[in-house]
């Protein structure tokens, strides 16, 4: 079933810019094989370009009870198109030591700007790092529509790899490179 491995429905690429520890901007493009338009680009029929702006008004402090709080908005402007990610959200995350590892609990709420789009409602997740010196992450979350489970591993401090199930029906893999540009 090599055909099944390469006959995927979507693709995604993104660029994330974090000029300050409390501010982040992301541009993403999702490629879909749905036939909503006539022009076919890169073997896809539809592209959804979107951006995200996130601010963190409250940072988590080690040894204190309060979580990190982030508020954000996705795809705030769209002249036309799908706007799959359009909405705003608030999220809180708290990390706890668990033996030699660490666990992070996240809860939030996403409000879709356009009804019937990608996400709408409460979401949450858990991430477990069994050993702090080993860059392995085991994750599970609920994304307002279903449960996702995944693993991630960081190579050479910059290359992140991951594999996950999508609502326990399909699967995905990914690769990203993270670096800090010094000025």
Regions found by a protein language model. Give the residues of each.
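Flexible, glycine-rich linker and terminal segments associated
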Residues: 160, 166, 170-183
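Outer-membrane beta-barrel transmembrane domain signature
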Residues: 3-7, 81, 85-157, 181-183
């Amino acid at each position: 079933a090599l055909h099944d491995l390469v006959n995927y429905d979507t693709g995604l690429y993104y660029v994330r810019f974090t000029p300050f520890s409390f501010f982040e901007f992301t541009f993403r493009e999702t490629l879909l094989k749905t036939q909503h338009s006539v022009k076919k680009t890169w073997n896809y029929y539809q592209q959804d370009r979107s951006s995200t702006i996130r601010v963190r008004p409250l940072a988590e402090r080690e040894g204190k009870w309060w979580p990190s709080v982030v508020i954000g908005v996705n795809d705030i402007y769209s002249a036309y198109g799908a706007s799959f990610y359009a909405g705003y959200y608030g999220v809180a995350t708290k990390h706890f030591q668990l033996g030699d590892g660490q666990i992070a609990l996240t809860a939030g709420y996403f409000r879709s700007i356009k009804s019937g789009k990608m996400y709408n409602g409460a979401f949450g997740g858990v991430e477990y790092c069994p050993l702090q010196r080993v860059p392995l992450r085991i994750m599970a979350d609920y994304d307002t529509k279903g449960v996702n489970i995944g693993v991630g591993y960081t190579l050479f401090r910059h290359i992140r790899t991951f594999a996950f199930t999508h609502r326990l029906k399909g699967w995905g893999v990914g690769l990203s490179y993270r670096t800090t540009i010094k000025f």
